[in-house]
């Protein structure tokens, strides 16, 4: 009789949803939602009768609208699969128990909030304020765009972006756009003009691409708004309610008197540039350090406080172990949490700037 356990007939329990599958599911949902948000208005044809509102896709040709609702869902799907690839890479690592329990749940939620609010980064007042301007400004802009799209889907009786609500809406949108764009300009100046040591030693070409795309998002947004207001004014539409757009409205006065056709073409050009910039943002999000927007808060949530920060794991007894290699030479030598750490790194250079080995001039770097 065999003394080995026979596991061949062991019942298989319910399959758990893996992290990479969750990424694909979220991306698929967002892609389908975006696609349907383009189809639904074509079927319902619900429009607002209020004179104080904004017509979505005003002056944008149908083929460009079709391209918008085709490319954006495709990019959302693409991004979700690229994130899934990163998560599957984490699964190549060895086990590392990071289970959430009743004992550590409250502490982990506090750590997660600290990651979302960038509490650690705010210790550096300049860098913290700069990143906050970009991060929270972008989130508000995303919320503004989402609110406009939701209003676009609703019947007349439920639409909410009109009257005083719309005035407040454009005020918040311009304020968020100004804060976001100013933050990006500050980041460019800090990285390529002021160039503090810890940033200078970590700058890579992808940083220029990221900042360029983000700057184009901000500038093109104001450009599209500027010419949308100017075009409508030239067409005889009363746009006094757009005075609450304290950036776009004054800019529109700079092109007062231009030919209506020129204003229309400029509006379309800036609108297309804005959408292309956002598509580029979706393209680089999962494949550059921008992914730390998602991975850093997750990493802080999963950090281990049971061991002192930086403490090394004990090595096995070298005379008794059967290991053929020590340390890490291939991906599989790391834990899945260590692989998540690498995808959460923002390449800020703080660890390098305080590393005593690096300070001696030796080619050693914790990053």
Specify the residue positions occupied by each region the protein language model found.
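Membrane-embedded alpha-helical bundles of multi-pass integral membrane proteins
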Residues: 2-328
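Generic detector of short alpha-helix boundary/capping microenvironments
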Residues: 173, 209, 333-336, 343
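Membrane-proximal linker segments that couple transmembrane helices to downstream signaling/catalytic modules
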Residues: 320-337, 359-360
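Structured cytosolic domains appended to multi-pass membrane proteins
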Residues: 336-367
